[in-house]
């Protein structure tokens, strides 16, 4: 500082330097905030991804185990359906009760672990995502595209299909009443007049 310069004359330069430093610090703070938010988002995404992978691994393990048990569930269901319920033999009656209780307990265990049975009722709309049509037959009781009978129940685990329900479907030209949620004729692959030679029905494979 020369003799002619005074402290008051230097103050504008010092104020400018301070203002620039403040702006630089503000910019650095903003960058750090943005970086912190980005790291937090990445951490949350990593957490969600880990949880999803863990749930998928758990669901896969249960699905594989459940698939191994479906055969036993099918056999118990068939045994219950074809058991002589009008039998007067106490031993037979007790055996039937035991089979029914075993099937009920197995289905309860399935439900507790997220395994849901797919067992459409007669007349329900065919759903290609949940059902597999193994045959189609003309019907006067069910409208075209409706389920006539379930040949084998299906199962889904936490929204993921384990096995589609094997069903017989009412063929084109069937005259039964339509279910309330039946698709429009233009969207129903079974609707409309039966084609010549289709009266006996044919195999239809619609794997989910």
Curated annotation (Swiss-Prot):
<dbReference type="GO" id="GO:0042803">
    <property type="term" value="F:protein homodimerization activity"/>
</dbReference>
<comment type="subunit">
    <text>Homodimer.</text>
</comment>
<comment type="similarity">
    <text>Belongs to the GrpE family.</text>
</comment>
<keyword id="KW-0963">Cytoplasm</keyword>
<dbReference type="InterPro" id="IPR013805">
    <property type="entry name" value="GrpE_coiled_coil"/>
</dbReference>
<comment type="function">
    <text>Participates actively in the response to hyperosmotic and heat shock by preventing the aggregation of stress-denatured proteins, in association with DnaK and GrpE. It is the nucleotide exchange factor for DnaK and may function as a thermosensor. Unfolded proteins bind initially to DnaJ; upon interaction with the DnaJ-bound protein, DnaK hydrolyzes its bound ATP, resulting in the formation of a stable complex. GrpE releases ADP from DnaK; ATP binding to DnaK triggers the release of the substrate protein, thus completing the reaction cycle.</text>
</comment>
<keyword id="KW-0143">Chaperone</keyword>
<dbReference type="GO" id="GO:0051082">
    <property type="term" value="F:unfolded protein binding"/>
</dbReference>
<dbReference type="GO" id="GO:0006457">
    <property type="term" value="P:protein folding"/>
</dbReference>
<dbReference type="Pfam" id="PF01025">
    <property type="entry name" value="GrpE"/>
</dbReference>
<protein>
    <recommendedName>
        <fullName>Protein GrpE</fullName>
    </recommendedName>
</protein>
<dbReference type="InterPro" id="IPR000740">
    <property type="entry name" value="GrpE"/>
</dbReference>
<dbReference type="GO" id="GO:0005737">
    <property type="term" value="C:cytoplasm"/>
</dbReference>
<dbReference type="GO" id="GO:0051087">
    <property type="term" value="F:protein-folding chaperone binding"/>
</dbReference>
<keyword id="KW-0346">Stress response</keyword>
<dbReference type="GO" id="GO:0000774">
    <property type="term" value="F:adenyl-nucleotide exchange factor activity"/>
</dbReference>
<feature type="region of interest" description="Disordered">
    <location>
        <begin position="172"/>
        <end position="208"/>
    </location>
</feature>
<dbReference type="InterPro" id="IPR009012">
    <property type="entry name" value="GrpE_head"/>
</dbReference>
<feature type="compositionally biased region" description="Low complexity">
    <location>
        <begin position="173"/>
        <end position="197"/>
    </location>
</feature>
